[in-house]
Every structure is written in structure tokens, then in C-alpha cells.
């Protein structure tokens, strides 16, 4: 969840109504007001609506929801004459670049704070901690086009933002706060990404820090936006969201030529939805014009096409719209959840905690007692992480996403160990030892069940530590187990064992293979243990029956 600060003065100016009305209706568009202060409110939004991570984005949505300004915003993008070239050497470092010029701005301190907040929120929600995408905002009048996005020597120096003396790029990774926080994204590469202008002045060292030369202030009238990353869609979506926010702040967007290609494309996408399908899903009886009117409140352009079809133009900044049902969800928001009729279920049942959840809770207590810290990795992952980096064959039973947003999230997780190793990779520059675990659902084919997994990473991690964790789990779960040597390319030969209960394998333990460790860019031995909680429950059920 993302919390943003909404200053009342700026927000009411953008929306055109009073604070009380805004605070009363704001939760209706999918927000949770965390805190109300004298001059601002802190509001939480779900990460699937990154277009609402700024005061400008909230104002745009609220104007529609309140009926002040409905329908979609038309973005007229003219050529700026500004161009970028990309160094081919960046292909293996940080290959993708998006850009735009925004002119005619008159920024207040509140507007600047809103843009900085949007920048950081997008770094988290879309950029995955700046790995997939990072944003730079520059005062265009302080630099000279054309610009180059190049791979520079680590010894290149410039004055970073909020500093007064030049530093080398290598120094920044050790001495600048942002450098220390994000050094792991670039340190392994022989050269670092850099954006320079026609006079070879540094604009930015993405994804670390901008140069102080291009600092955006209340005097800034024209902005150069750059978005770099390792994921092209994340880069493109981010450019659209930031451009749309800056239009709300009073700017006009102009395109930038990147190696001959114009950026950005702010045209809407078009979908045709069924009124009948929407009514069945929501339990309503809306006509096509009525549903179109509701969609206009949500800032779509909606045109009835007969009695059962609506042509919907989806704004460029709505990256969350991937299915017709996403549009119907906005119909429900505009209709008002408070206006739906409440009905009681025909049957009444009394719930209780499932046995698998009980076992999962016991596993968490045991591993916490052993010094492991619980983490919650994503449910979506990729075949690269799940199979390729684990040196395993790809499984035909993996559940694939039909329309994945990124190459990092193409399947539903089938295992937990790869995700724990990925988390170790993300934290590889942190202090050792690192001991983490997780419990949760995995999916194979159409079967969903729960597993638990734990890893320990440090210089002395070995098979004995993995066995000790497995023994503690089985002992405290009252599992009469035996072990048997087994093989798996993810583990070192001769250092992997199955946990067997009543002739059934319920888990594994062992020492991770050096090939896997190196694949995840780690440098230390790793001990691992994994339990199939479904199998543990089956044993308990059989024991209880006998």
C-alpha cells in the first residue's frame, strides 16, 4: 500500500471544491484516509492505481467522480526538437529509456513535493526499488540538447543532488545516501549509466541520483523527464503517468526523439465491453447510456454502441486496466458501493481455522524461535527464477499468466525456495548471517497447496544446519520422520535429503548448489529446508483416524 500526502490548499485548487467534500468522498474512489491534519491528509492507495500516487492524479480522478469534469483528458503531444541517443553498451546494464519534455509550468513548493512523492511511490510500486525503472526530472533550461544516455567510466565525476562538491560515480555508491541505498543495482557492472547533455554536462546517474545542476525549483518552467530501466513496459507506463500528472500541474507535453523513435505515446487504448456482462457481474440493470455515464465519471471516454456494447477509451495513465472486468469495477465505484442492495446469504455457517493454517502457524513459531525472520515474497514470479536459476527443468504444470505485465511475473509460484533465494539476492550487500523463511500457497496445474521454506546464508552455512532446522521442525510438529539421500540439481550432490513420514516425502533439506548460488549473484553457502504442509496435514489426519 502507498501512502501519499495531500495538501488541502493545492488539492482544493486543482479540484475546485471544498476540503470537507473531498475528504467525505475520497474513500469512495478506493482510498483509505490514514491521518487528517490541519493542512493536509495522509491517504493510502492500493498499488494497482499508480496514477493516484500524486495530488494531481487524485485531483483528476475526484473532478470526474464529483461530476465537475467528466470524460477523458485529451493529450496533444507536439515535437520538442529534443533528442536522445542510447549507447549500445547499456544493453546489458540498463537498456531502456523513456523521455518527454513538459513546458509552461509554474510550480509551487506543494507541486514540487507532490512530484517528488509521485517519483518515490512509482519507484516502489512499478520500479521494484528502482530496479525495473527509475525517474529523473530536470530543469531543461539549465542544460543543452541533444542528450546522450551512455555507459560511463566509474571515475567520471559530477556534483550530485544536495551536495556541493563533485564526487566520482564510484564514490557516490559509498558516500551518498542514495548511492548506498541503490548501489546493488549497478555496482557489478564495469561501467555505469549516465545521462549527459550536448556540452557533456551530467544530468543524471540513473538509477542512483540526479546532478545538482538540473535541480527542479519553483523557478523551473520547463522540465526534461527521463525514465530508465530494465523493463520496457515499466519505463513506458511511468512516463505516461508522470506526464499526465504534470499536465494537471499546468504543463504541456512535447515528445522526445530517442534513437529515431518518438516518446511518449499518450493516446488512449480502446476496448469494447458488454453491458449485459457488466450487469450480470455487478447485479445491476443499467442501460448502455447509464453505464457510459458512470464510466465518464471515472475519466473514461465511453460511447454506447447499440444496446449491449460500449466503446471505451482507456486513458494512457490507466496501466491497471487489463480486462473488461477492470472497467466494470470502475462502474461499481462510480455507481457507489453504498448504493448496492445488501442481501443476507441463504445459508449460515460457522468458520474455523483450517488445519493447514494451524500447522503453518506452528511452523512460523518454530522457525522464529530458531532465529529466522519471516518474509512474504510475491505470488507471481518467472520461469527464470523458478527453474532456470535453480538448474531445474521447466515444468509443464506451471500456471502461466495470459497477459503478463512484466517478464518478472509470468507464472504463479510453484515453489518457495527460489523466491527466498531471490530475496537473498536483493539483500546481498546486507550484513550476514541472513536467515529468512516464508509459508504460503503454491500452485501446480489447478492444484493449490501450502508449503513452508527457510534458508540460511552465511560463511558457515552447511548441510548440518539444514538438518538441524529440519529436525527441529519435525520434532516440534510431532512428526516421526526418517531421512533418505536424494538428488536435485538445485542442491549439492550428496548434501540433500528427503524428510519421510509414514513412507511419504513431506519435505527436503540440504545445501544449495554453488551453480545456483552464483546464478542468484550470491557469494556464500546456503542451507535450506522445505516442508509440504499438505503432506504434513495428511499424516495428522491419518493419525487422528487411527
Curated annotation (Swiss-Prot):
UniProt-listed SMART domains: B3_4, B5
GO MF term set: ATP binding; magnesium ion binding; phenylalanine-tRNA ligase activity; RNA binding
Primary localization: cytoplasm
Alphabetical keyword list: Aminoacyl-tRNA synthetase, ATP-binding, Cytoplasm, Ligase, Magnesium, Metal-binding, Nucleotide-binding, Protein biosynthesis
Biological processes, Gene Ontology terms: phenylalanyl-tRNA aminoacylation
Subcellular location: Cytoplasm
Protein name per UniProt: Phenylalanine--tRNA ligase beta subunit
Residues annotated as signal peptide: none
Entry EC no(s): 6.1.1.20
Cofactor requirement: Mg(2+)
Family annotation (SUPFAM superfamilies): Class II aaRS and biotin synthetases (SSF55681), PheT/TilS domain (SSF56037), Putative DNA-binding domain (SSF46955)
Subunit-level organization: Tetramer of two alpha and two beta subunits.
GO cellular component, one term: phenylalanine-tRNA ligase complex
